[in-house]
Design a protein with these regions (language model features):
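Ligand-binding pocket scaffold of soluble enzyme catalytic domains
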Residues: 489
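…; additionally, a secondary subgroup of soluble metalloenzymes is captured
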Residues: 1-483, 492-642, 646-871
Length: 871
């Protein structure tokens, strides 16, 4: 303390007390005390003056102010001749420890020695200033050490876990962890002689003790403890010695790890450190014998996720559709965890890949479950049954096949081979069973005197060429001011069904799906013409075989525009419409009652050899793009009725084709005018037992004199492979000719509003008596297009302490579509932090939406761990 500060402090004391004692034990100010020049104050050196003399002088001069200075400690009360004077005086301390005690606002004088021992830390003014913001008047020596450690580590809170996060974060550089590095903060802790305090804190709060403790060893202990607590069954012998010994404190370690994982700011650091620890432990080999059930609650290491994926993949391959409910339940729990949580999918490539692994496994499980319901193949009583069965159910084979490959492709950049076996199995079932079986059954309703090729009409199905008459015109005649027709090239039925689900998940949008009987051959020129308003269709005598609509060419957008004028319509490309924006878009459509919008993604990508392998990626993009166009039409252009359809569908397989996929047709027949992979057009083609044949007058209602004969390959075969052959269309398989029609309307009706499922707690759980407590919840509504799934975070919170969490915060997803209540139950375990939890205080079980953080559920609950520990 400076001489000036001593002067100021004494002056302040003398303003309220006539007598001030100063015991300068270290004699720091012995040489300067005479020069203080305190006006009106009599200095008495007690070490040189008898106490009785001092006592008498004070009594004789009651108006005098006295500074009684001594370089000795205060005497014991029984030996203090000036005790009565001291009782009505003020004690002044000028040693650094006393000053710090005062500066920090501490009330315990016994801390002066401790502050002396922490002199190295307290020497820096900035550290003292930061410490002052954390200190409370009643803090103990241990409290001060903990807060000094927080200052040195720059932790957000003066808590061990916050310090550990900062220390371990410093071990990660550019996403790579180095467990041997000594963080700068750790060096500061050692330099300030606080290392023993750190390890004492670790022992008290975690039960960690070691003859030679290190940050690296502590990290291994914490992570292995968390892993083993989640493991069903005994821990591997190689890991048992790492587990923290105290079960209660081990639970606290798990809470820390859970929060660490959930902290989005520390997400990358945790992942890097966990991977480094797993590698050091050789965890991959230790997990080789573990089942998914044993590991389902272990969220510590990424290698666990890969092992679970591997185990579930084997079950799916071996199960062939059996016992998939167990697999689906295990996958749902893992998706709520850390490494494969869809909410974190944007974090990094590996997380996206793990999410994709479960997407692929889910699609595969559903695919094999669907196959298990059709073990005998397919058999259709008639064409109408065949068409409706594909429309209502069998399209799912194509959809799940696409979903699987889309997800599996997203895993490939990692180099993981975990899905390769499953990919081969799916491919074998789809290309070697589903398509051949469907082809055989479909051929039976195609051929013969009563077959589709002869009539090409179904009583309850709209022909594609009647689209305008049966789908558009009734809307216009019914009072709709303006109808938008959105046509996406090669937008097959199963992709359309996905768009409907996506659309119905939005409030104010109501979408319904139907199917039309596509024209045959199922290719762009004929399909696009069929969708336009018209009286007649015919082929023009030309080398291009252009299709005439009411005598007009309609091959280009400009030609279609010209044709649509007669119907108060206009044609525009989807990307051009979107580029116009709201105001110019409204101006474009203002004077028209019919707007045809053309979108091309799937056909543009799939119909080229260099890009056909990206067909499924293009399908997913189409759903997003068409959804955006729909939103623009309804929200910006005030459209109230939109029809989404296609010119044709497509067939696609991931595996390369071989000779068995090629039609046995020796050569194209005489009279052929156009030859493609999936159709031939010409005149007087005759018939062949190796192909389906017919005339467009029957399959597209072209005029008699403007019709052409066609041949299309049976089943899924191709006439040739030139220019790519995985993506094809043109023939008569349901994937090609079951053409979707989506009707989208804007509505404010209550049933058109989307909302999240409701969740309730099951049972009368109103008290927590153990460190780990199970809670069971029920999803009261089944997930539908309008009733949306919900991911939530659950925790126990201290209501009276600012809603501070006192447990871990696991996430759980409620996404069941089952109508059975028992199948909509989900349970979790919450681990309560150690410490004193008052059984009379209010604590709450709190559930919050994982994305919006909106509170979903709050229930009061008692926490009485002492009660539970008695039993």
């Amino acid at each position: 303390m400076s001489q000036q500060r001593v002067f100021d402090s004494l002056t302040s004391l003398f303003s309220t007390h006539p007598v001030v004692f100063w015991h300068d034990v270290d004699a720091e100010f012995a040489t300067v005390v005479d020069g203080l020049q305190l006006g009106g104050v009599q200095l008495v050196r007690l070490d040189d003056t008898p106490a009785l003399r001092v006592k008498l002088d004070i009594e004789r001069k009651p108006d005098q102010r006295w500074l009684i200075y001594s370089a000795k400690p205060e005497p014991e009360p029984t030996k203090d001749w000036l005790l009565d004077v001291r009782m009505r005086s003020k004690l002044f301390r000028a040693d650094s420890s006393s000053i710090l005690l005062e500066d920090l606002g501490l009330t315990t004088q016994g801390l002066r020695q401790h502050l002396k021992e922490r002199g190295k830390f307290l020497r820096a003014r900035d550290r003292v200033d930061r410490l002052k913001r954390l200190v409370l008047p009643g803090d103990t020596a241990a409290d001060l050490d903990r807060k000094m450690l927080a200052v040195l580590t720059r932790a957000d809170q003066p808590e061990l876990f916050a310090m550990l996060q900062r220390l371990y974060a410093a071990m990660v550089v550019d996403g790579v962890a180095n467990l041997s590095v000594e963080p700068k903060a750790w060096q500061d802790i050692a330099a300030n002689e606080l290392t023993p305090a750190f390890w004492e804190l670790s022992q008290v709060q975690l039960g960690y003790a070691d003859a030679n403790p290190t940050l690296r060893d502590l990290l291994l202990r914490i992570l292995v403890t968390d892993f083993c607590r989640g493991l069903q069954g005994d821990a591997p012998q190689q890991l048992a010695h790492f587990v923290l010994p105290d079960r209660t404190l081990a639970a606290i370690a798990s809470v820390f790890v859970g929060r660490w994982r959930a902290d989005i700011a520390q997400y990358g650091n945790y992942n890097a450190l966990a991977r480094a620890v797993a590698k050091e432990l050789d965890l991959v080999n230790l997990l080789s014998g573990q089942s998914a059930e044993n590991l389902v609650e272990c969220m510590t290491f990424e290698d666990v996720e890969l092992r679970v994926v591997q185990d579930l993949k084997k079950r799916i391959v071996a199960g062939a559709g059996a016992n998939m409910d167990v697999v689906r339940s295990l996958m749902a729990r893992r998706r709520d965890g850390h490494w494969a949580n869809p909410l974190l999918a944007s974090a990094n490539e590996r997380t996206r890949a793990l999410v994709a692994c479960y997407d692929a496994l889910t699609a595969a499980a559903d695919f094999f479950m669907l196959k298990a319901t059709h073990t005998a193949g397919f058999s259709f009583a008639n064409a109408d049954t065949a068409f409706s069965q594909y429309r209502d159910e069998l399209f799912r084979f194509d959809q799940l096949y696409r979903h699987f490959h889309t997800a599996a492709d997203a895993v490939e950049p990692t180099g993981w081979a975990v899905l390769h076996e499953l990919r081969d199995t799916i491919e074998g079932v789809y290309s070697g069973w589903f398509i051949p079986q469907l082809s055989i059954a479909w051929a039976k309703v195609m051929e013969g005197p009563q077959g589709l090729l002869t009539h090409w009409k179904l009583p309850e199905v709209t022909p594609q060429q009647a689209f305008y008459e049966r789908k558009v015109l009734p809307l216009l005649d019914g009072g709709v001011k303006r109808v938008f027709v959105l046509i996406s090239d090669a937008f097959r039925f199963e992709v359309a069904q996905e768009l409907v689900q996506h659309t119905n998940s939005k409030s104010r949008f109501k979408a319904s799906l139907d199917a039309m009987m596509g024209v045959l051959p199922s290719y762009t020129a004929l399909g696009m013409a069929a969708l336009l308003p018209h009286k007649t269709m015919a082929y023009k005598e030309s080398t291009n075989l252009d299709v005439l609509v009411d005598g007009h060419l309609v091959a280009t957008l400009e030609q279609r525009n010209e044709h649509l004028k007669a119907f108060g319509g206009i044609g525009v490309k989807a990307e051009d419409l979107m580029a116009l924006g709201k105001d110019k878009g409204r101006e474009l459509v203002r004077d028209h009652r019919l707007i045809y919008i053309y979108h091309d993604r799937i056909d543009m990508i799939g119909d080229k050899q260099v890009s056909e392998t990206k067909t499924f990626e293009a399908a997913a993009q189409s759903v997003q793009e068409l959804s955006s166009v729909l939103g623009f039409i309804i929200n910006s252009l005030n459209g109230s009725a939109v029809l989404v359809t296609a010119d044709h569908g497509f067939m696609y397989q991931e595996s390369a084709l071989d000779g068995s996929d090629k039609s046995t047709l020796d050569d194209k027949p005489g009279g052929t005018l156009k030859a493609k992979k999936r159709y031939l057009l010409g005149r007087d083609l005759g018939t062949s037992s190796k192909a389906w044949s017919g005339n467009t007058a029957v399959t597209a209602d072209t005029t008699l004199d403007g019709s052409l004969d066609f041949w299309v390959p049976k089943g899924a075969s191709r006439f040739h492979f030139a220019g790519g052959a995985r993506f094809v269309h043109g023939s008569a398989m349901p994937q090609e000719i079951v053409v979707p029609v989506i009707t989208v309307r804007e509505t404010e009706a209550e049933e058109a509003k989307t909302k999240y499922v409701n969740i309730s707690l099951l049972g009368a759980v109103n008290k927590v008596v153990t460190n780990t407590q199970r809670f069971e919840f029920i999803q009261t509504d089944a997930v539908t297009e309008r009733m949306l799934a919900r991911s939530v975070v659950v925790s126990l919170r201290d209501f009276s302490d600012g809603d501070k969490p006192i447990s871990d915060e696991p996430s759980i997803t409620f996404d069941s579509t089952s109508q059975l209540l028992d199948e909509r139950k989900r349970s979790i375990f919450l681990t309560v932090l150690g410490g004193a939890h008052d059984p009379h205080k209010r604590y709450d079980l709190v559930m919050r939406d994982a994305v919006s953080k909106v509170e979903v559920l709050r229930l009061p609950i008692k926490v009485d761990l002492a009660f539970g520990n008695d039993f």
